[in-house]
């Protein structure tokens, strides 16, 4: 009962706390800030509220949210300033006049993914500036006064992918500044960079997808060779890198220069001549040169438009240079009055390059709100506004645009023909919006478009022929959307070199009509998709493996079925992916036809099978030989053990005569039939030991107490039982039989051992035979052994033996014995010495 009451009280308190939390969050949204829920994320808009510290704001504790603090008075961020903001995923601190961020200011923001510090007065990024932001993926710090970055400033931001540092005062980058981050986008435009080394900087951004280096005073000398070499090896979007110095390369694009242009090999004879010629040019130009040619930045407190009057590329025809001199080379167009929309910042490189209009985060809801219209805009940045629809007439007066940035808005609708007038547009950013469907008329008029960014939308469908009008399209980012499939021939009319399909919902991707339409040497990112590694993915596997150049940026990782989850597609065998299908090695193989002027086409051609190589790899050969050797050793060892066991299975007689047990032997009769055995050195015939104990009931084997000699003297007869008589007796499990046979004296004298030498060859078949069973006894161990001389003296007197053996079957003839000793009892009793001599002689046989 008490436990139930306790449980109810706990639930009540939890409910009250949750209600209070909701009430507090509601009060914040109602009184201090404007709150709006979008995509299950709460947007807390606290812009221009005059906050001097964020400790005055109490955020909700049980919901994730985006916090907008733009346009406040947060000039300094103190330690633990955001300790209560653990559920914030996005934090906007732009236009606050922020000058200092102290150590631990961002502690508590463990889930923060995007941080915006743009349009402030920061001068340095220290190693401890971003402590606590382990989950940060997007950092925007453009339009500040940043002139120095410490080497470990980004070392804790292991998940950082996008870094925006454009329009600052950076002279150089410290070594290993990007060592611990995996950047995909880096913006360094509008700084004061002259060189960029490979060691310590470029070597750590190998996974970069976009790097912008425009509007820097690049020093195109031998020091720029590492950057030039790096640019020649990548295919990512870089932007225009224009030389500022030396004089001879002023205004040239670095990507169009050769190594000889950057670092010429001058001989001693003409080096002085070229030097004096260059000095003459400089002296002639100096009186008339506009100071604006030297890129400088006005004090950023007032933030006036940045003027970078970069000269137009000079004429390369030597005749013109000699006729008109350098004044003609650097002559620019007549000044044109520049107009800039209110609430925007406009900069210009030169009158012929147009105007850069920066209207980021100005709360515009429509593009038509930009008044007055800018004059000849070259680049228009409308990032981070509240645009929801791009109307058909919004961009009619922006035909000179080269770049249009509409990212991070709320655009869900683009009316048909909205971009028709943008015939010169090369870069279009539509990332971070709410687009769901792409259709062909959406991109009408963009025949010059080269770079299209559509990542981080909610795109679920792309209509056929959507990109057909984009004949110059080179880069297409569709990552982080909801795509499950692509229509046939979707990329047929493009010239793509970079395609990003990362983090969508693709389980399969057909080759025919999709991948086979991609041009040569394309880089494609297919990672973070739920790939289903079954038979349907074999086309994609073949396409990736038969490509002539490495086109896959990241590996294709299987998500299903469960047995292949987490495995890389290219490491899976065909049988593992599709075990029930026929052998695919004899099936369809993708053939690739390359042409320098035409896109690569992947076609299915039965006659264009790849050449089959029958050579066995060395590693496989060595492994096979090793297996054969091991099997041979095992087989030989088994055969040896088998033979050894067979040999041990043959019975043998011990060689030690003192420990010999009588086993079996055969006695030669006049007529006999018996089994044969090989004679050994320790055969039983060498000697017959005295009997040991009473082993059977036959009297002849019964040893009586007292003198054993008297026993032999009283022995009256030998017992013999014929087969016929045995038949009359009742059957018993065992019975005893003894036999005595006198050995006839040999016709010729010979050794006793020769008696049984060829006994195996003298087998004769008896006329009739009967089956007789024998039970024998083991004789006692003899107490002494006579000498050899004694045995020799009594050898001729041996005339009988006693047969002992193990139980065995044999055939005994029923013929009547002829020896007188077998017909009656002995005529006389044996003498003791005679018995002893006989026993001694027999024991030596």
Swiss-Prot record:
Gene, per the UniProt record: SLITRK2
SUPFAM superfamilies, alphabetized: L domain-like (SSF52058)
Domain LRRNT: 331-373
One annotated GO biological process: regulation of synapse organization
Topological region Cytoplasmic: 643-845
Tissue-wise expression: Expressed predominantly in the cerebral cortex of the brain but also at low levels in the spinal cord and medulla. Also expressed in some astrocytic brain tumors such as astrocytomas, oligodendrogliomas, glioblastomas, gangliogliomas and primitive neuroectodermal tumors.
PROSITE patterns assigned to the protein according to its UniProt record, in alphabetical order: LRR
Keywords, comma-separated and alphabetical: Cell membrane, Cell projection, Disease variant, Disulfide bond, Glycoprotein, Intellectual disability, Leucine-rich repeat, Membrane, Phosphoprotein, Repeat, Signal, Transmembrane, Transmembrane helix
Quaternary structure annotation from Swiss-Prot or TrEMBL: Interacts with PTPRD; this interaction is PTPRD splicing-dependent and may induce pre-synaptic differentiation. Interacts with NTRK2.
Record's function text: It is involved in synaptogenesis and promotes excitatory synapse differentiation. Suppresses neurite outgrowth. Involved in the negative regulation of NTRK2.
Region (Disordered): 263-321
Bilayer topology term: Single-pass type I membrane protein
Subcellular location: Membrane; Cell membrane; Cell projection, Dendrite
Region (Required for interaction with PTPRD): 167-215
Pfam families with a match to the protein in the record: LRR_8
Domain of life of the source: Eukaryota
Composition-biased stretches (Polar residues): 283-293
Glycosylated residues, chain numbering: 84, 421
Modified residues (Phosphotyrosine): 756
Phenotypic consequence of residue 9 to I: Found in a patient with a neurodevelopmental disorder; uncertain significance; does not affect surface expression; does not affect function in synaptogenesis
Effect of residue 426 to C: In XLID111; likely pathogenic; decreased surface expression; decreased localization to dendrites; loss-of-function variant unable to rescue defects of excitatory synapse development and synaptic transmission when expressed in SLITRK2 knockout-out mouse hippocampal neurons; no effect on interaction with NTRK2
Disease: Intellectual developmental disorder, X-linked 111: A neurodevelopmental disorder characterized by moderate to severe intellectual disability, delayed development, speech delay, and neuropsychiatric and behavioral problems such as anxiety, attention deficit-hyperactivity disorder and autism spectrum disorder.
Species per Swiss-Prot/TrEMBL record: Homo sapiens
Transmembrane region(s): 622-642
Effect of substituting residue 792 to C: Found in a patient with a neurodevelopmental disorder; uncertain significance; does not affect surface expression; does not affect localization to dendrites; does not affect function in synaptogenesis; able to rescue defects of excitatory synapse development and synaptic transmission when expressed in SLITRK2 knockout-out mouse hippocampal neurons
Protein name, per record: SLIT and NTRK-like protein 2
């Amino acid at each position: 009962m008490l436990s139930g009451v306790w449980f109810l009280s706990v639930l009540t308190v939890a409910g009250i706390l949750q209600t209070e939390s909701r009430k507090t969050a509601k009060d914040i949204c109602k009184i201090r800030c404007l709150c709006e829920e979008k995509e299950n994320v709460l947007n807390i808009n606290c812009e221009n509220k005059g906050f001097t510290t964020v400790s005055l704001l109490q955020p909700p504790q049980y919901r994730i949210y985006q916090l907008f603090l733009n346009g406040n008075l947060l000039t300094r961020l103190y330690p633990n300033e955001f300790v209560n903001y653990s559920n914030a995923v996005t934090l906007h601190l732009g236009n606050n006049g922020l000058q200092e961020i102290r150590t631990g200011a961002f502690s508590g923001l463990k889930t923060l993914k995007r941080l915006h510090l743009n349009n402030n007065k920061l001068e340095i990024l220290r190693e401890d500036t971003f402590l606590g932001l382990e989950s940060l993926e997007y950092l925007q710090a453009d339009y500040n006064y940043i002139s120095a970055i410490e080497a470990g400033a980004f070392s804790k931001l292991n998940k950082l992918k996008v870094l925006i540092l454009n329009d600052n005062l950076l002279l150089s980058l410290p070594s290993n500044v990007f060592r611990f981050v995996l950047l995909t986008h880096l913006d360094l435009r509008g700084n004061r960079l002259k060189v960029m080394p490979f060691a310590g900087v470029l070597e750590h951004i190998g996974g970069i997808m976009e790097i912008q280096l425009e509007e820097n005073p690049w020093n195109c000398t031998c020091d720029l060779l590492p950057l030039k070499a790096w640019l020649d090896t990548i295919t990512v979007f870089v932007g225009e890198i224009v030389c500022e110095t030396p004089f001879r390369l002023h205004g040239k694009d670095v990507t169009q220069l050769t190594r000889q242009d950057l670092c010429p090999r001058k001989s001693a004879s003409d080096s002085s001549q070229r030097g004096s010629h260059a000095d003459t040019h400089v002296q002639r130009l100096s009186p008339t040169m506009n100071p604006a040619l030297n890129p400088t930045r006005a004090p950023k407190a007032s933030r006036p438009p940045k003027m970078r009057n970069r000269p137009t590329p000079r004429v390369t025809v030597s005749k013109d240079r000699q006729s008109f001199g350098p004044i003609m080379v650097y002559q620019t167009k007549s000044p044109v009055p520049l107009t800039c929309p209110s609430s925007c910042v406009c900069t210009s490189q030169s009158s012929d390059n147009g105007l850069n209009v920066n209207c980021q985060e100005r709360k515009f809801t429509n593009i038509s709100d930009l008044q007055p219209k800018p004059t000849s805009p070259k680049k228009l940045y409308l990032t981070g506004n509240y645009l929801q629809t791009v109307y058909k007439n919004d961009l009619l007066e922006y035909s000179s645009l080269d770049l249009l940035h509409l990212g991070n808005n709320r655009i869900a609708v683009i009316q048909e023909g909205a971009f028709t007038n943008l015939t010169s547009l090369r870069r279009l950013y539509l990332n971070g919006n709410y687009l769901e469907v792409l259709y062909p008329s959406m991109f009408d008029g963009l025949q010059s478009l080269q770079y299209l960014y559509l990542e981080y939308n909610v795109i679920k469908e792309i209509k056929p022929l959507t990109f057909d009008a984009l004949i110059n399209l080179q880069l297409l980012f569709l990552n982080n959307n909801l795509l499950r499939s692509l229509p046939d021939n979707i990329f047929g009319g493009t010239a793509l070199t970079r395609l990003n399909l990362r983090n969508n919902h693709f389980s399969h991707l057909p080759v025919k009509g999709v991948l086979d339409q991609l041009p040569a040497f394309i880089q494609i990112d297919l990672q973070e998709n739920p790939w289903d590694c079954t038979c349907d993915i074999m086309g994609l596997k073949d396409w990736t493996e038969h490509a002539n150049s490495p086109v896959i940026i990241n590996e294709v990782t299987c998500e299903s079925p469960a047995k292949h989850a987490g495995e890389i597609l290219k490491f899976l065998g065909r049988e593992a992916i599709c075990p029930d299908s026929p052998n695919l090695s004899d099936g369809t193989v993708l053939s690739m036809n390359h042409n320098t002027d035409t896109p690569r086409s992947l076609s299915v051609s039965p006659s264009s099978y790849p050449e089959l190589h029958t050579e066995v790899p060395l590693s496989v050969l060595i492994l096979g030989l090793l297996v054969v050797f091991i099997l041979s050793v095992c087989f030989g060892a088994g055969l040896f053990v088998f033979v050894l066991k067979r040999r041990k299975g043959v019975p043998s007689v011990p060689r030690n005569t003192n420990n010999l047990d009588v086993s079996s032997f055969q006695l030669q009769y006049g007529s006999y039939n018996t089994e044969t055995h090989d004679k050994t050195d320790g055969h039983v015939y060498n000697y017959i030991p005295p009997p040991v104990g009473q082993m059977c009931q036959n009297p002849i084997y019964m040893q009586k107490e007292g003198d054993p000699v008297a026993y032999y003297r009283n022995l009256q007869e030998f017992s013999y039982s014929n087969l016929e008589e045995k038949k009359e007796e009742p059957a018993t499990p065992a019975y005893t039989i003894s036999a005595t046979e006198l050995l006839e004296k040999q016709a010729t004298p010979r050794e006793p051992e020769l008696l049984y030498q060829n006994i195996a060859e003298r087998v004769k078949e008896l006329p009739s035979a009967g089956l007789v069973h024998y039970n024998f006894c083991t004789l006692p161990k003899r107490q002494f052994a006579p000498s050899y001389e004694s045995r020799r003296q009594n050898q001729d007197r041996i005339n009988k033996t006693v047969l002992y053996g193990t139980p065995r079957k044999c055939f005994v003839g029923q013929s009547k014995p002829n020896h007188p000793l077998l017909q009656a009892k002995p005529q006389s009793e044996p003498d003791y010495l005679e018995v002893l001599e006989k026993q001694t002689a027999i024991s030596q046989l």
